[in-house]
Amino acid sequence: MLSGLVIVDKPQGWTSHDVVGRMRRLAGTRKVGHAGTLDPMATGVLVLGINKATRLLTYIVGTSKTYTATIRLGESTVTDDAEGEVVSSHSAAAVTEGAIRAAVAALTGEIQQVPSSVSAIKVNGERAYARVRSGEDVKLAARPVTIHRFDVHAVRPERAGAVLDVDVTVECSSGTYIRALARDLGEALGTGGHLTALRRTQVGPYTLDQARTLEQLAEELEVLEMSQAARALMPNRELSEDEATEISFGRRIAAGAGAGTPEAATADNPAAAFAPDGSLVALLADAGGYAKPVLVFAPSNEQPGK
């Protein structure tokens, strides 16, 4: 049975669910999931799990993400991106690059962000975007996010300077809305702003260099096998033959070297445990003087792409 991660370069106009559907056909299995949605207008890294690798997706969802984006200053839209109707315009002609960089700096670090009202967040059991489309004025609560990096690469005047297109790179915590960053940057500068382009270049340890288009994957289904995926994602622990046997039966073993320290493996941040042959045996959490399995992966002879 084929199991592993597929790093897809999602095309513009496709929903994440569309990509999952296509992968189900390519992989010949219904058991395919993704590690965090990407808006239809966005392109770039979408991490999919096939069969047993779907169990790794929980640990990928919460990792940091990196994006390249273009923010247009001078116009606000109902969706905070280029797909929505323009609801206000204010000339950005007087906005300097220095002012932009200062506003960007204020949006870097740990901030409170109000998600875009046109989002998949549920409000009383209904998606926020559905409420907005029905004419409701939706107000979402602010939530803490971390902007690790917010770099300005270029500022390009358009329409005789009435709008400014700002090319940026953003590295951020899971749950950050880049559309909301564009909106908030525009509000801070008094011009309004929205997102016109978005490309995700990294999810956790998985990068655009590893990603393949759907066309490429239709020709050759490149799968990052389980042990490689887990080695890149979390701390590693090498097991002896006896330890691997004990863990494969769900039994506990001696705790890892980091037990009792802030680096100790936990259920939320486990260590990947490998047999002497390099195969992924389990995910482990330290508990006192012992390590216990959080997830156990049955041994298999699967080969990626076979």
Swiss-Prot record:
Single GO biological process annotation from the record: mRNA pseudouridine synthesis
Q: EC number(s) of the enzyme?
A: 5.4.99.25
Question: What protein name does the entry list?
Answer: tRNA pseudouridine synthase B
Species in which this protein is naturally found: Arthrobacter sp. (strain FB24)
* Enzymatic class: isomerase
Give the catalytic activity. Answer: uridine(55) in tRNA = pseudouridine(55) in tRNA
Active site (UniProt): D39 (nucleophile)
Tell me any Pfam family this protein matches: TruB_C_2
Which keywords does the record carry?
Isomerase, tRNA processing
Write out the function statement from the record.
Responsible for synthesis of pseudouridine from uracil-55 in the psi GC loop of transfer RNAs.
Recorded GO MF terms:
RNA binding; tRNA pseudouridine(55) synthase activity
Q: State the family named in the UniProt similarity comment for this chain.
A: Belongs to the pseudouridine synthase TruB family. Type 1 subfamily.
